Amino acid sequence: MKNNTKSFTFSNLGLLAIALFWLAATAHAQIFPTARAKTRAESVPDGYSVIDGDIIMPTAKVKAILSGQKELPDVNDAVYIDLLWTNGIVLFEFDINVSAANQSAAISAMAVLESVANVQFEQCPFNSCPILANFVHIQNSTMNSSQVGMVGLRQNLNVANWETQYVIVHELLHALGFYHEQMRSDRDTYIQINCGNLQGGCNGDVYNANFKVPLLSVNYGYYDFDSLMHYDECAFSNDCAAGSTCACTNKVITVRPPNQNQQTLIGQRTHLSALDRATVSFLYPADDWRFYDCTYPAILGTGTFLHPYADPITALVATPPGGTLWVLKNCSFPVRVYNQQVTVKTAPGVTARFGN
């Protein structure tokens, strides 16, 4: 995705809407608006369990998260990057149970993400991916679900609500590496989980599998109530059928002050928020984008979003002519003559300055 080039043009764009959890896992999103069905063997691979309502991850990892323990061996940041799709290319195939109309619906959903990020969905020749390739197998199901990130070899993406485009987009975002917004470690600052209205309360299996925050989560940006990846206010309410969402009276999720105007808006499945778009574009950026964060450890900086440059001069010099340098924190550039023809943009709430 290319931008018009301006020399040191500053603008505020939405940074990140979503809590990103770089764990090899699977997510399955709420069926929308119908009730959630039980997990089927063909939808969830052996050795995987459901967590976060629509997240299916290796059972051993689920046990580690729910017990408050890290998995061994310890996972470091370098491994997290490997969960992104190489060069933004996502190979896929359709199961024979997916109709032509539903295939078209999925391809249209893919186009939504291709329009905002440097990602490309490529259907395998003859709709059959090599057995040793990394690819997404898209199938008709009684649930909406998707493995999270590029987990290696075949991974399933299940769709029940083909008629709702942004339910499919939601699942594709899981496949690109995203978890849910309300799984952020800072979520209790913004929303309250009403245990009395939740199926089984806050000590039950529903809470543990759907609302408990993993220790290994990584947050970027501010809390986005408008995110496509947020639960709705009635998720798993006692008013609803088991494992489902409905027009409940006793809300499970209450938005805290001063953001109560978002109460009925959370959980939308109609669009990508501005921050959703920014998030996916940063993780799958244009080839000429670089990132700068003066608070990041310099020795680790490579110019990517996850590992930005810490030195402003290094960042500017490394940005290709005509490219874009994103400033991720309140940072400054030293006073000097600059001849790099690049566009400099800032994340939301971030101020980039020249001089002290």
Give residue spans per PLM region:
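Hydrophobic beta-strand residues in large extracellular and virion-surface proteins
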Residues: 121, 136-138, 157, 292, ...
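Bacterial N-terminal signal peptides
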Residues: 14-24
